[in-house]
Amino acid sequence: KTGEPFRSLMSELEHSAMLASWMSANMPTMRSLLVDTSIFYEGGISETQDLAFSISIALEYMRAMTQNGLSLEKALKQISFKIPIGTNVFHTIAKLRALRIMWARIVENCGAPANLNPALLDASISKRVLSGRDVSVNMLRASCACFSAVAGGADTVTLFPHTQIVSAPSSSDRRIIRNIQNVLKHESFIANVADPAGGSFYVENLTDIFAQKSWEIFQLIESKGGFSKQLLAGSIYEMVEKAWKVRKNNLDTRRDSVTGVSSFPDLYENLEKIEAVVEKKLKSQNKTGLGFNDLALD
């Protein structure tokens, strides 16, 4: 979270490329490299920044693999994406659709057909949108995230039990979170439609806006040497830190409201366990004070 790698970043990329080459030769149906921007998203970055980071990291992987002797077609088959999502339904739908558009453009600019290898997306609900207070509301958040992920074209969806922020989930908690997906699949039939949001002017327009703004951030990162160089230089950390300050202020001033925390809180809820979790978090992050966001975020 400080932007400092545990080991040489270039060495890690080289080893990742070697692993991908071995996987391509010995287990061609498996994907070895996962683009996961969860740590940045939980740090407070916006949807467009998250898209730009994802594409930039994927391009770093692709360059490392091709430089290691892997063909472009085989390199593309080694990459998959884990995209953190929130509870804003339309933003999530547009975000996932925009990522596919941007990735297709990257593939095409690299000299391959745009439809050679569509992005494989795992949409995972971010812990930053889960609340430690009134945890039952997390079931609604998970439902929104799951619906929007499927409507946005995710290949797989990852959800967390609603109690995970404050305690170890019980078997009942895990069953509830599984059934959210089952209900959406078997009762709404949303999975039977290829592109549920296709044709909606609002969604199409929002997708274009996300793609355009994300592409501009991506181009800025690339113009300065790529994601790895910017990470080592501290620029990525600065972007995350700036985004976090904006998000924290919006949460603390209720510009961004959190149901059950800053809006409609349960004033009679037993907060002892929650306060213990928050205190542990504050100590680990060297923070002082207790804002609405500290109760809302993991």
PLM regions: where:
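Catalytic alpha/beta active-site cores
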Residues: 1-84, 150, 160, 292-298
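Phosphate/diphosphate-binding loops
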Residues: 2-21, 135-138, 217-231
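Secondary-structure transition/capping motifs at alpha-helix termini
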Residues: 25-29, 63-76, 102-117, 147-155, ...
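Mobile "lid/hinge" segments at catalytic clefts and subdomain interfaces of large enzymes
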Residues: 29-59, 151-198, 204-214
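A glycine-rich phosphate-binding loop feature that marks nucleotide/adenosyl-phosphate handling sites
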Residues: 36-42, 75-86, 118-128, 160-167, ...
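Short glycine/threonine-rich loop-to-helix capping motif typified by GTGT followed
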Residues: 46-51, 86-98, 126-140, 167-177, ...
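Gly/Pro-rich turn-and-neighbor structural signature
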Residues: 50-122, 127-129, 136-137
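Catalytic-core signal marking the mid-to-C-terminal active-site face
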Residues: 175-298
